[in-house]
Amino acid sequence: MPNVDLSERSRLRAGKKMNGLVIILIGIVALGAGYLFYGRWLAKKWGIDPDAKTPAYTHEDGEDYVPSSRFTVFSHQFSSIAGAGPVTGPILASVFGWVPVLLWLIIGGLFFGAVQDFGALYASVKNEGKSMGMIIEKYIGKTGRKLFLLFCWLFTLLVIAAFADMVAGTFNAYTVKDGVSVLADAANTNGCAGTISIMFMVFAVIFGLIQKKFNLSGWKEAVVGLLCVVASFAIGMHFPLILSKDAWSYITFVYIFFAAVLPMWLLKQPRDYMTTFMFIGMIAGAVIGLLVAHPTMNLPVFTGFTNEKLGTLFPILFVTVACGAVSGFHSLVSSGTSSKTIENEKDMTKVGYGAMVLESLLAVLALCVAGAAASQDGTPASGTPFQIFSRGVAGFFEMFGIPVHFATVFMTMCVSALALTSLDAVARIGRMSFQELFAVDDMKNAKPWRKV
């Protein structure tokens, strides 16, 4: 075969271009059917008891074990697992073509990722809300528990470092030119998003206190949550906070400290609840935009089993597309925090399986947006995956008549929240893993250093 460069090979394999509308409809139908049939079949097969008392009630402590409504737990689960991965992974892996990425998102999401998330949640709820480490001790032994928890804690440190840098960089209002720090072109946009993020933290506490005092649920809870979201955006759009990346790093670390130690109902849960409304708006905007504009999928169908930059399709595709298909981190969220707040076992399917299905849909959307942004010859759009996704969805919002500035700020806030909601979840899981690593059976008579 004559030598051809990668771009030419991509064009040769591209064939007839697919309409983006068809791809997103395939994703919605496949993922929806998987949830309705396979997810419910698993629940029936494993055995869900709606009358059983969950750990949220039997071990209620007002901190980690807190009975919560179905949507509250779902919002926590979804916002915690939907980090940077579902956006960055599919876009980076699309160099192999959009078909292998789409297949892995659907097959992996339904039969691997959702099963793992649901299974971890189920196992924890059925074992008194114990985390994965404590369940390992029950079936394997204390050495297995300690090894797992040590790995888990070290893993959380790496994720905290990476995601904190990502969040701080998103809100950073400065850039360096010729060795001098000057205001960036996007300073106002980033500053507005930064203020909104801080307002989310403030209103989350207010929302949590209101929920606690008035025991809100259903539409009342949703209305108060939406009002807090609107108020956060209203304040943030008018008062941009112009700070450096270092300043935002300090703010981020202060926030995740409190998110890790404060009761779930006071900060983490209400913030996740508010953030989920924003994510749903982002996903709805992307879906409607793709349905209305139905752009062409400009990325090639399949480029081959090797890529000169990433390497071979196996295992790179499955490493790059983790969140959105299957990610071990999700099991830590399911067993570490969500299982302790489930108020009824019948909610586990929607929380464990359903949240993963929605994340897979988000990943399919990211792939379609990247395909629409690519050039006619299949060359990927310039910029980071977050930038490509943000520009694409913001463009859909502008198409609906939403002002450019608001659309840009909204998407900047969304992509930062994808990282931040996973960051605070990781911080809390890291704190719990560290505690469990040094825990003993009789903590009342344990040595002082262990209690500390």
Predicted regions and their residues:
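Extracellular/periplasmic helix-exit of transmembrane alpha-helices
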Residues: 290-304, 357-392
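Hydrophobic, membrane-embedded alpha-helices of multi-pass small-molecule transporters
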Residues: 69-85, 245-262, 274-276, 285-295, ...
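Membrane-interface "cap" regions at the ends of multi-pass membrane proteins
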Residues: 33-87, 276, 312, 316
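Extracellular loop-to-transmembrane helix junctions
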Residues: 19-36, 93-123, 133, 192-204, ...
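Hydrophobic alpha-helical segments and their helix-loop junctions in multi-pass secondary transporters
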Residues: 208-213, 227-250, 258-260, 265, ...
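Flexible loop linkers connecting adjacent transmembrane helices
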Residues: 40-66, 92, 106, 115-144, ...
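Membrane-helix boundary/coupling elements in multi-pass transport proteins
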Residues: 84-91, 108-116, 120, 124-128, ...
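Loop-to-transmembrane helix boundary motifs in multi-pass membrane proteins
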Residues: 142-157, 354-360, 407, 436-452
